[in-house]
Swiss-Prot record:
Biological source species: Methanocaldococcus sp. (strain FS406-22)
Family from the record: Belongs to the creatininase superfamily. FAPy deformylase family.
Assembly behavior: Homodimer.
InterPro entries given in the database record: Creatininase-like_sf, Creatininase/forma_Hydrolase, FAPy_deformylase
EC number: 3.5.1.102
PANTHER family: 2-AMINO-5-FORMYLAMINO-6-RIBOSYLAMINOPYRIMIDIN-4(3H)-ONE 5'-MONOPHOSPHATE DEFORMYLASE, 3-DEHYDRO-SCYLLO-INOSOSE HYDROLASE
Name used for this protein in its record: 2-amino-5-formylamino-6-ribosylaminopyrimidin-4(3H)-one 5'-monophosphate deformylase
Keyword match Cell inner membrane: no
Biological pathway: Cofactor biosynthesis; coenzyme F420 biosynthesis; Cofactor biosynthesis; riboflavin biosynthesis
Length: 225
């Protein structure tokens, strides 16, 4: 079967060899404003939008996610579980002509799988890259992005509730003592949230989403050169 590779609004025919995968987390507390699957929804939104605007193939989502042992705000898997799922997606992607894979990751703990990417490249003889787009957990940036996407319940009352760090210790990781003690970056971010609180900024959310999608598009353009 001769496929019409030039059809549609695509960058060029080479883009059909690029596959985009969304990576996030499904089971994580995000305060009162955001749902537990916020990270994978943001990753999917960005990845799918970039796919639509370029013609690259959106291959779907990775269901498992991983996290540092000292960050306790959800239910996660081992890095090896994420690796195994990526193996499945890459193996299936190769069958439809994908030669280069771009993982859009929107969950900080998943950076633990980056060390496996070279193994995937070697095993399948493909290119595998990962873009990390992450925010201070359940804080102003993530709340604002979620609001623009339509997944945040950010009315005045709920936002006030969200800022109760005793009830929602995962917000900004302010109340996650073990995480703050073990990770300086987490502690610094938590201090900012403690000082300024979590606010809704629609313009900021729109700006972050656009910049994130543009970042993925630029990477796709780079991969087809």
């Amino acid at each position: 079967m001769q496929l019409r590779l030039s059809s549609g609004n695509i960058l060029n025919e080479k883009v059909h060899k690029i596959g985009i995968i969304a990576l996030g987390s499904f089971l994580e507390n995000h305060g009162a404003v955001l749902p537990i699957d916020t990270d994978i929804k943001i990753a999917s939104y960005i990845a799918l939008k970039a796919s639509i605007l370029t013609g690259a193939k959106f291959l779907g989502v990775v269901i498992p996610s991983t996290e540092y042992e000292y960050v306790k705000h959800g239910i996660h898997n081992k890095p090896e579980d994420v690796y195994s799922y990526l193996r499945f997606l890459i193996n299936e992607g190769k069958k439809i002509g994908i030669e280069k894979f771009l993982i859009v990751n929107c969950h900080g703990g998943n950076v633990l799988v980056e060390s496996f990417l070279k193994d995937l490249e070697y095993e399948f003889d493909v290119k595998v890259e990962m873009i990390n787009i992450t925010f201070t957990h359940a804080s102003t940036e993530e709340v604002s992005v979620g609001y623009v996407m339509g997944i945040a319940k950010a009315d005045k009352e709920t936002l006030k509730e969200h800022n109760n760090f005793n009830k929602y210790p995962e917000v900004g990781m302010v109340g996650l003592k073990e995480a703050r003690e073990n990770n300086k970056a987490i502690d610094e971010e938590a201090k900012v949230v403690e000082k300024f609180g979590v606010k809704l900024d629609k313009e900021l959310g729109e700006k972050i989403l656009k910049e994130s999608i543009d970042k993925v598009i630029e990477k796709i353009k780079e991969m087809i050169r």
